[in-house]
């Protein structure tokens, strides 16, 4: 099979030569070579030869972007087996077969049905095969060929980036590289000049230029000044076909900004300035601003201000505001119009960051003169000191002078000044001030231990202008006097072991004093000399504001005495010296041999009784509850009793029932059996409560040993003898007073009752001697007796 290619038409001569070569090759390839085959037929061996392929193939070319109405002819497939009778069928497979490329299966002509773009796909690989139309058997093996898309100049150059934004320092040398731009062309760079790009500048001359081959942009002028022009817009063109007429082109914009360098010194707008400052301006406050201009920007415009000379250098100072680049003039010392009315300052502003490449442009600093006018202001009174410190002793009398403050009018008028205290807190009311002289006095008695320090605020005002006020703080320290005696530092729980030895230290005590250190230490500890010498304990002053308690004798017994009391004296070193007395309580405890406490008297009692602390508390609570019940019961019983004496208006003939059994309290207490069991409890004599005894016996004093040794019989005899000789104990006779009926009683008279006694048995004259209570009874019975007599 042979392939003809009539599509190679550009240039024509080359295509004709190429077609002639193709046909020559096909002619020489028409020789068929048979493939060797071995076949056994009836014992004979038949040799077959494989014929040589009858294909002739090559590359086909097709123009891109074909816009004709008919399919574009690509080429022709032909096989040597094709006799022109239509028995050979051509089949085309591969990339684009049947869609982009179609084949006439009889003639082998190939056509392109679509417009192709080389930039999308440069070539197509296809497969061709010739088969027998009747049997569909291949006449020759399948062959592969390529269809290449022929390039045309249909793509303009394109810049990879853009628009571009770049910077270049101002005052740069001519030819300084700014940026390199690059444009690409999608056409085939190996075919003609379709992809050969040339650069040119359309806008931006004469400031910048571009290299036509590399696309490098450079400065075209020397010393371009940012302050004159800062921004430039440069348009660069890229054109293919080596820039020839008819070539395609693309463009981009490059925005170039000149960056600043320090090529301009600072300049003050004026050479002379004038500033007004009132004399009342506060020290440290800003009184004015000044600024020098710099055409540069950023750090190149940074500057510092300084005072280089002038008569106000010690009065004023200047600093630089880094944000606004202004010089801030501040006051270092107070102004006084009466002393100086104006000042002159020379102020300099200089760049901070210098560029030595431009030092030839001159010094990068400037100076100006500032005149300051001091304004007269009516000022408030001025105290002689910014604050005052005074001292006064505690317990000083009311009206004691503490100190004096002084304020004057600083103006030339020298107005009179008045003083007063701002009573903002309660502490200020301990003092007052003389409005004319400024003398501060006490109004209360001060106590250093309660308040050691006072702070008061004194205000001064002018009489002519009361609105002008000045304030000053007065600190008053209260000095200490020795008015507090020393006392024990705390309550001490001191114990002594039963097995203690003489001279043994059992405890160490210390003292405190509310007074100041100068009037407090040192403390002296001693025993009161007015008391007898304590035989059990002594006191030793350690001369370090402590004292030790020592034993005087050997061994102590809890059964004999379990608690001892030791009175001590403590004095301080103040002038005059003060002292106080205290009593130490010392308990006797049982200790181990190594000195550890085992039990004390309270613990021993509980342990011997077999009771714990919780059990003891429970017993006490039960006893208290029982006592409360008994008291409540007795109170209710007593509230139900009638009064012993009934008033005259409330006498009735009623039968009164008494529920008391036995004797009274005197009878029950006189024969209390506890007196026999504990004779010492009977030492106190019992007296009747309804009368006052006429004679009292002196109490008896007997030793406990005598009472313990006497027996019960002797004790009873002794008490019986005392009762017989004592007129103040029962039995004894006394006059008892009872209620009487009275004249207005609603009850009937008892005279209606007949007496069972005879006349000789009763004598009623004695009733008149019993008093007014029996007067009515005497009258009744006296009349009856007289009637009987008559």
UniProtKB/Swiss-Prot annotation:
Q: Which residues carry this modification: Phosphoserine?
A: 786
**Annotated signal peptide:** 1-24
Q: How does it sit in the membrane?
A: Single-pass type I membrane protein
Q: Which residues form the propeptide?
A: 25-53
Source organism, top-level taxon = Eukaryota
**One GO MF term, please?**
beta-catenin binding
Per the record, ranges on the Cytoplasmic side are: 637-790
Residue ranges annotated as transmembrane are 609-636
| Extracellular domain ranges by topology | 54-608
Record keywords, A-Z: Calcium, Cell adhesion, Cell membrane, Cleavage on pair of basic residues, Glycoprotein, Membrane, Metal-binding, Phosphoprotein, Repeat, Signal, Transmembrane, Transmembrane helix
Q: Which residue intervals define the domain Cadherin in the entry?
A: 54-159, 160-268, 269-383, 384-486, 487-608
From the record, what ranges are coiled-coil? none
What GO cellular component entries does it have? adherens junction; catenin complex; plasma membrane
State the compartments where it is located: Cell membrane
- Glycosylated residues (UniProt): 36, 255, 455, 536
Which terms under GO biological process does the entry name? adherens junction organization; calcium-dependent cell-cell adhesion via plasma membrane cell adhesion molecules; cell migration; cell morphogenesis; cell-cell adhesion mediated by cadherin; cell-cell junction assembly; homophilic cell adhesion via plasma membrane adhesion molecules
What InterPro entries does the annotation carry? Cadherin (IPR039808), Cadherin-like_dom (IPR002126), Cadherin-like_sf (IPR015919), Cadherin_CS (IPR020894), Cadherin_Y-type_LIR (IPR000233), Catenin-bd_sf (IPR027397)
Specify whether Metal-binding is a keyword of the entry. yes
Give the domain note. Answer: Three calcium ions are usually bound at the interface of each cadherin domain and rigidify the connections, imparting a strong curvature to the full-length ectodomain.
- Primary role: Cadherins are calcium-dependent cell adhesion proteins. They preferentially interact with themselves in a homophilic manner in connecting cells; cadherins may thus contribute to the sorting of heterogeneous cell types.
Q: What is this protein called?
A: Cadherin-18
């Amino acid at each position: 099979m042979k392939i003809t290619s009539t599509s190679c038409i550009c240039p024509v001569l080359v295509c004709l030569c190429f077609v002639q070569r193709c046909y020559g090759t096909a002619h020489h390839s028409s020789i068929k070579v048979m493939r060797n085959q071995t076949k056994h037929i009836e014992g004979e061996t038949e040799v077959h030869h494989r014929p040589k392929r009858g294909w002739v193939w090559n590359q086909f070319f097709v123009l891109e972007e074909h816009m004709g109405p008919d399919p574009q002819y690509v080429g022709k497939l032909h096989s040597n087996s094709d006799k022109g009778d239509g028995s050979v069928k051509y089949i085309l497979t591969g990339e684009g077969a049947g869609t982009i490329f179609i084949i006439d299966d009889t003639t082998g002509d190939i056509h392109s049905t679509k417009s192709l773009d080389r930039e999308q796909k440069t070539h197509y690989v296809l497969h061709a095969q010739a088969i027998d139309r009747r049997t569909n058997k291949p006449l020759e093996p399948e062959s592969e060929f390529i269809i290449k898309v022929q390039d045309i100049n249909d793509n303009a150059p394109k810049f990879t980036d853009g628009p571009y934004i770049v910077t270049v320092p101002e005052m740069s040398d001519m030819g300084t590289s700014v940026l390199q731009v690059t444009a690409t062309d999608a056409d085939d760079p190996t075919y003609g000049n379709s992809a050969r790009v040339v650069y040119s500048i359309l806008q931006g001359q004469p400031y910048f230029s571009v290299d036509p081959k590399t696309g490098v942009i450079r400065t075209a002028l020397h010393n371009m000044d940012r302050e004159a022009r800062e921004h430039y817009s440069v348009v660069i063109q890229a054109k293919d076909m080596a820039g020839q007429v008819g070539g395609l082109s693309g463009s981009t914009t490059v925005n170039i900004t000149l960056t600043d360098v320090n090529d301009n010194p600072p300049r003050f707008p004026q050479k002379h300035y004038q500033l007004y400052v009132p004399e009342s301006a506060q020290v440290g406050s800003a009184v004015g601003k000044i600024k020098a201009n710099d055409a540069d920007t950023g750090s190149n415009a940074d500057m510092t201000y300084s005072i280089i000379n002038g008569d106000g250098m010690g009065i004023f100072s200047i600093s630089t505001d880094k944000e606004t680049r202004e010089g801030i003039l501040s006051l270092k010392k107070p102004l006084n119009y009466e002393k100086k009315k104006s000042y002159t300052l020379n102020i300099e502003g200089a760049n901070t960051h210098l560029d030595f490449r431009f030092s030839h442009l001159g010094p990068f600093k400037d100076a100006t003169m500032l005149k300051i006018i001091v304004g007269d202001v009516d000022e408030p009174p001025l105290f002689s000191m910014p604050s005052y410190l005074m001292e006064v002793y505690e317990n000083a009398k009311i009206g004691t002078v503490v100190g004096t403050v002084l304020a004057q009018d600083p103006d030339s008028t020298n107005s009179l000044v008045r003083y007063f205290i701002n009573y903002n807190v309660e502490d200020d009311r301990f003092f007052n001030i003389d409005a004319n002289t400024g003398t501060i006095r006490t109004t209360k008695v001060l106590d250093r231990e309660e308040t050691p320090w006072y702070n008061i605020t004194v205000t001064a005002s002018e009489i002519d202008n009361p609105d002008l006020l000045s304030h000053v703080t007065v600190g008053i320290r209260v000095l200490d006097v020795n008015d507090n005696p020393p006392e024990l530092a705390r309550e001490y729980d001191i114990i002594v072991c039963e097995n203690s030895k003489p001279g043994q230290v059992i405890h160490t005590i210390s003292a405190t004093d509310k007074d100041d250190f100068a009037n407090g230490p040192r403390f002296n500890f001693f025993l009161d000399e007015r008391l007898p010498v304590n035989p059990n304990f002594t006191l030793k002053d350690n001369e370090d504001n402590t004292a030790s308690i020592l034993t005087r004798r050997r061994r102590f017994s809890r059964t004999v005495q379990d608690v001892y009391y030791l009175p001590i004296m403590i004095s301080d070193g103040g002038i005059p010296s003060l002292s106080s007395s205290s009593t130490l309580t010392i308990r006797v405890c049982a200790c181990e041999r190594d000195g550890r406490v085992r039990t004390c008297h309270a613990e021993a009692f509980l342990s011997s009784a077999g009771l714990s602390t919780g059990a003891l508390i429970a017993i006490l609570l039960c006893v208290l509850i029982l006592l409360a019940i008994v008291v409540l019961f007795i109170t209710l019983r007593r509230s139900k009793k009638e009064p012993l004496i009934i008033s005259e208006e409330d006498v009735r003939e009623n039968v009164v029932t008494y529920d008391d059994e036995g004797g009274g309290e005197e009878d029950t207490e006189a024969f209390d059996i506890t007196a026999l069991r504990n004779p010492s409890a009977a030492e106190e004599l019992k007296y009747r409560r309804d009368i006052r005894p006429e004679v009292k016996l002196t109490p008896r004093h007997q030793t406990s040993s005598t009472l313990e040794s006497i027996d019960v019989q002797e004790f009873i005899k002794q008490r019986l003898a005392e009762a017989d000789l004592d007129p103040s104990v029962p039995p004894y006779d006394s006059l008892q007073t009872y209620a009487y009926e009275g004249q207005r009683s609603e009850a009937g008279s008892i005279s209606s009752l007949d007496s069972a006694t005879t006349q000789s048995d009763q004598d009623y004259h004695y009733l008149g001697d019993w008093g007014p209570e029996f007067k009515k009874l005497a009258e009744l019975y006296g009349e009856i007796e007289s009637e009987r007599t008559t």
